[in-house]
């Protein structure tokens, strides 16, 4: 089974477990959603495998987090006491990370999570199951922000950069998606992409995504430049 089909199965499993009362209050995000935002069939087949599902949760404060944990336990999620990731719960053998919009809840967040929740789109995962999905422009912004926090300046080895480049490779409308975003978001994406373009390792990361296909490599760079020069 391809990585994208495995990921869809993972997303469906989590969505079904959450049930109608929780599913619409959470936004699916992260590497497991990359394939849902890609429109190019070739790129879909190149999507990396990831072993966890990420969701943004609209909660404020630690007390709200503990309340959510109790609700999730009823749904079949459990706490793995051996896990170092504070936001992680386990559904059978599947890792599921619930990431709050408020830093006070668990001591971390992503500056774009709150807006990502406010702008999330409905996505029909199956004929009978609809989830809230991060929009492409906020996917890009959250990945850039995540790379700043954990990428250690290594664009070539970063899964965040890999996911980001798969979007630029495989989503034909990504330049228009970002062009229609708020000025703050456009400027942030532009500034971060400029920094990446100045990193010598970034070119190698693009080459890896393009599978050394010169035409695909050129397309990726053209789309990135289109988002940098958005005015």
Please give the residue ranges for each predicted region:
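Compositionally biased terminal segments of proteins
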Residues: 1-231
């Amino acid at each position: 089974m391809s990585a994208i089909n495995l990921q869809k199965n993972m997303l469906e499993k989590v969505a079904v477990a959450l049930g109608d009362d929780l599913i619409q209050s959470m936004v699916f995000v992260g590497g497991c959603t990359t394939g849902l935002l890609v429109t190019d069939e070739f790129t879909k087949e190149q999507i990396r495998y990831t072993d966890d599902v990420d969701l943004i949760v609209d909660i404020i404060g630690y007390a709200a987090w503990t309340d959510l944990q109790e609700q999730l336990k009823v749904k079949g999620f459990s706490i793995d006491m051996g896990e170092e990731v504070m936001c992680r719960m386990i559904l059978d053998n599947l890792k599921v990370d619930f990431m709050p919009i408020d830093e006070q809840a668990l001591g971390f967040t992503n500056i774009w999570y709150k807006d990502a929740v406010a702008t999330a789109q409905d996505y029909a995962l199956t004929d009978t199951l609809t989830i809230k999905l991060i929009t492409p422009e906020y996917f890009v912004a959250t990945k850039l922000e995540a790379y700043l926090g954990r990428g250690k300046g290594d664009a070539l080895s970063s899964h965040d950069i890999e996911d980001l480049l798969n979007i630029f490779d495989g989503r034909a409308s990504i330049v228009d998606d970002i062009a229609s975003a708020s000025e703050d978001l456009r400027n942030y994406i532009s500034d971060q992409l400029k920094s990446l373009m100045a990193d010598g390792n970034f070119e190698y990361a693009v080459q890896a995504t393009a599978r050394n296909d010169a035409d695909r490599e050129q397309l990726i760079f053209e789309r990135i430049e289109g988002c940098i020069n958005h005015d």
